[in-house]
Amino acid sequence: MGQKINPLGFRLGTTQSHHSLWFAKPKNYCEGLQEDQKIRNFIKNYIKKNIRISSGVEGIARIEIQKRIDLIQVIIYIGFPKLLLENRPRRIEELQMNVQKELNCVNRKINIAITRITNPYGHPNILAEFIAGQLKNRVSFRKAMKKAIELTEQADTKGIQVQIAGRLDGKEIARAEWIREGRVPLQTIGAKIDYCSYTVRTIYGVLGIKIWIFVDEKK
């Protein structure tokens, strides 16, 4: 059997960059990682609770964290910032205060910035959320996959592969189904491929969604 490496880790330093930028002593390293995870989870939960989203898509592509001695800079790359920024200054301040309270950090300031991304459906995380929303609403998995591919084609990408695994359409035996459109060169390190794996709970059990999007090739 072929062993499949994570496409993001495989390309770190060439076409992919780290989402956390900071240094720590080896003994404090695990604390830093846990803190990052806490920040990311808190922001995602906050957005889920405070924004009424009809499509079920929160629209977070990624959250970057940069740390200095006295400052934690968090950049949220979001596809639909209007939902979050309807009364912008108050909401961002509220989020900053809540994160600071959650982390219980006295001598470090937290600064949260929001960056809008063009072509939100060209990002696998947002696309996976869209598919998850469709599956929760009992839309057929094939229909959800095809709709996702249509959305990606509008975002001007070179190729996409979508895989859904689990009890598809409530069948008793779990299986994996996938669909590919265009080129997805997973073995080419110079190819910029965005990847996401996402878990969704449905009434039939847990389904796993994996998405590979071929964005561009490094010349």
UniProtKB/Swiss-Prot annotation:
Gene3D superfamilies: 3.30.300.20, Ribosomal protein S3, C-terminal domain. It is found in: Plastid, Chloroplast. InterPro entries: KH_dom-like_a/b, KH_dom_type_2, KH_sf_prok-type, Ribosomal_S3_C_sf, Ribosomal_uS3_bac-typ, Ribosomal_uS3_C, Ribosomal_uS3_CS. One of its GO terms (molecular function) is structural constituent of ribosome. Its main location: plastid. GO terms for cellular component: chloroplast; ribonucleoprotein complex; ribosome. Residues 47-118 form the KH type-2 domain. It comes from the Eukaryota. Belongs to the universal ribosomal protein uS3 family. HAMAP family: Ribosomal_uS3_B (MF_01309_B). Part of the 30S ribosomal subunit. This is Small ribosomal subunit protein uS3c.
